[in-house]
């Protein structure tokens, strides 16, 4: 179910910091129209930590409504309190989410056995698929290949979003888990080599800006057309990289605001990029022709 190009959706806010529901609906429709394979609301890129529980549920509800079964919805549900994650996961299942993306517990830094028991408990509480989200740079915890091999034996643990950036580790994971266990790149810039190693797709930040192009890149990879994929990668790699010039989702929301897709609003402790980085973002957008393209489409 969760293969190909999944978009880690941003969460748009109004200037009064409230959730901008009309903008969110427009962004979701834009993704579906562009041909992405699944949607991922309320992850890191969706500023999940600064959403209230009610807002979290509302964002997922809107995503389910707007997707209308056209693409699966993989909703964020992670944390360092297993019991609370279970309750959130149950609520998301009730709302119609097709699966959950669950980041590893952070701050309390569980052992590998603790990680296994954490995900096993979540899996026992819900019937929809779980994608493990391993991002050591943010959580301080790495899900080791041996742990993922164990987790893959649990029926509804369906895959991993692997954001270690460690190609050797990803190769080991692919070699040890069943073929149907989705190994998804958590980094746009290395999605191509991850799929070449046997991975199944990406959970993408850059697809917020270029959904059709990123969907095409991933589809080319999955079809083995790496010459085409490399050309797309060459064109859009600067955008993939500039999205992380500061903490995500600061740069991507800045770019989307420049493209006329949303208001440039974050919730503290996130702040707008520095002026010099804003100019770099604008330069990349102009170099690949995105600003005028989207503004023109928005006015037609």
Residue ranges and their predicted role:
Residues 24, 56, 60, 85, ...:
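A general structural signal for well-ordered alpha-helical segments in protein cores
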Residues 6-12, 34-36, 45, 196-199, ...:
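C-terminal alpha-helical cap/extension of soluble enzyme domains
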């Amino acid at each position: 179910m969760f293969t190909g190009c999944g978009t880690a959706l941003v969460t748009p806010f109004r200037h009064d910091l409230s959730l901008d529901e009309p903008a969110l609906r427009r962004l979701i429709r834009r993704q579906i129209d562009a041909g992405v394979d699944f949607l991922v609301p309320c992850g890191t890129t969706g500023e999940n930590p600064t959403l209230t529980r009610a807002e979290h549920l509302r964002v997922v509800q809107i995503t389910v409504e707007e997707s209308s079964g056209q693409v699966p919805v993989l909703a964020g549900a992670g944390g360092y309190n297993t019991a609370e994650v279970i309750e959130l996961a149950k609520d998301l299942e009730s709302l119609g989410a097709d699966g959950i993306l669950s980041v590893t517990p952070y701050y309390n830094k569980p052992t590998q056995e603790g990680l296994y028991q954490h995900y096993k408990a979540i899996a026992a509480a819900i019937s929809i698929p779980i994608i493990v989200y391993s991002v050591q740079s943010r959580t301080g915890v790495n899900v080791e290949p041996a742990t993922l091999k164990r987790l893959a034996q649990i029926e509804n643990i369906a895959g991993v979003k692997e954001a270690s950036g460690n190609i050797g580790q990803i190769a080991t994971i692919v070699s040890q888990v069943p073929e149907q266990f989705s190994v998804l790149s958590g980094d746009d810039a290395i999605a191509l080599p991850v799929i070449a190693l046997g991975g199944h797709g990406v959970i993408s930040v850059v697809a917020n800006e270029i959904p059709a192009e990123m969907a095409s890149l991933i589809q080319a990879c999955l079809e083995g057309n790496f010459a085409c994929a490399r050309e797309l990668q060459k064109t859009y790699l600067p955008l993939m990289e500039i999205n992380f010039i500061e903490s995500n989702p600061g740069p991507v929301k800045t770019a989307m605001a420049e493209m006329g897709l949303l208001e440039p609003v974050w919730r503290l402790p996130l702040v707008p990029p520095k002026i010099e980085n804003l100019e770099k973002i604008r330069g990349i957008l102009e170099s690949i022709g995105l600003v005028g393209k989207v503004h023109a489409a928005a006015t037609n």
